[in-house]
Amino acid sequence: MIIGCSASQKLAASVADLLDEPLCPVETRKFPDGERYIRVKEEVEGEVTVVQSTGYPQDENLMELLFMIENLKDLGADYVRAAIPYFGYGRQERRFKSGEAVSAKIVAHLLEAAGADEIVTVNLHENCLSEFFRVPVRELSAMPLIAEHISFLDDPVIIAPDKGALGHAREVSDILGCECDYMEKVRISPEVVETRVSDLDVEGKDAVVVDDIISTGGTIVNAAGILGKCGASSITVCCVHPVLVEDALLKIFSAGVERVIATDTLKSDVSEISVAPLIADVMKD
């Protein structure tokens, strides 16, 4: 049985289609005071997969997921797999300042307490997040899907906007068999720090910036400006999770980016690539 919660109903339907399984009808709504109501409209037994990203509004989507997991267990499900394509609160995996809550750890504990038997997610922002769980965690990578989607480019070079994203960029470049580099900050003087492509010459090439998350777009705008000055013939931006806060897309396109491509872990105007095949493959195992 497959269930799609409010944030991922279309994605859940795609997974169900790929597996030729029915999508369980559910009712989700809010009471006038804002509290959440959920109802599963079919008998529940055996293994159930719940698909729900926990992006904005994070608290509402997370609470709905917790309600659904525990409700399914109460209704008779033997095994509940929580497929969380985008894992909200995943960027607070440690205390950056004294007294801060480690949000990712708390969310992990809540999911387990609700009764999740397994977590399936896509490209966690920090690899250590899986260590917060005692139940199995299967982290899937959407980079092969991104590589396939941009294979039409004649002379691509894959660029990580910072060293932290280099692993993602290399995964794409290895699949395509093309060059890869990253943006690095170089101190020119005590007062001046310059950001530039580390080693690679991008002049006349199709530059593809690859990252896991685009939020405000600031990092991408900076990278696009540098790539433009270095003579890239075109600039494409790819990400797994299009958080895209406020006018992020406008800023990115205004910086000279030709196209922005993302997956459907989150709904957006640029979610061209579906991660449904990744989730479906897990359920076949």
UniProtKB/Swiss-Prot annotation:
Cofactor: Mg(2+)
InterPro entries for this protein: Pribosyltran_N, PRibTrfase_dom, PRTase-like, Rib-P_diPkinase, Rib-P_diPkinase_arc
Amino-acid positions noted as binding ATP in the UniProt annotation, renumbered to this chain: D33, G34, E35, R91, Q92
Gene3D superfamilies registered for this protein in UniProt: 3.40.50.2020
Binding residues annotated for Mg(2+) 1, in chain numbering: H125
CDD domains: PRTases_typeI
Family the entry assigns: Belongs to the ribose-phosphate pyrophosphokinase family. Class III (archaeal) subfamily.
NCBIfam families according to UniProt: PRK00934.1, ribP_PPkin
GO CC annotations, alphabetized: cytoplasm; ribose phosphate diphosphokinase complex
UniProt GO MF annotations: ATP binding; kinase activity; magnesium ion binding; ribose phosphate diphosphokinase activity
Binding-site residues for Mg(2+) 2, renumbered to this chain: D162
Pfam families attached to this UniProt entry: Pribosyltran, Pribosyltran_N
Enzyme Commission designation: 2.7.6.1
Protein name listed in UniProt: Ribose-phosphate pyrophosphokinase
Binding note for cofactor: Binds 2 Mg(2+) ions per subunit.
Keywords: ATP-binding, Cytoplasm, Kinase, Magnesium, Metal-binding, Nucleotide biosynthesis, Nucleotide-binding, Transferase
Ligand binding (D-ribose 5-phosphate): R187, D211, S215, T216, G217, G218, T219
Catalytic machinery residues: K185
One GO term of the biological process aspect: purine nucleotide biosynthetic process
Pathway participation: Metabolic intermediate biosynthesis; 5-phospho-alpha-D-ribose 1-diphosphate biosynthesis; 5-phospho-alpha-D-ribose 1-diphosphate from D-ribose 5-phosphate (route I): step 1/1
Subcellular location: Cytoplasm
Described function: Involved in the biosynthesis of the central metabolite phospho-alpha-D-ribosyl-1-pyrophosphate (PRPP) via the transfer of pyrophosphoryl group from ATP to 1-hydroxyl of ribose-5-phosphate (Rib-5-P).
Keyword field contains Glycosyltransferase: no
Catalytic activity: D-ribose 5-phosphate + ATP = 5-phospho-alpha-D-ribose 1-diphosphate + AMP + H(+)
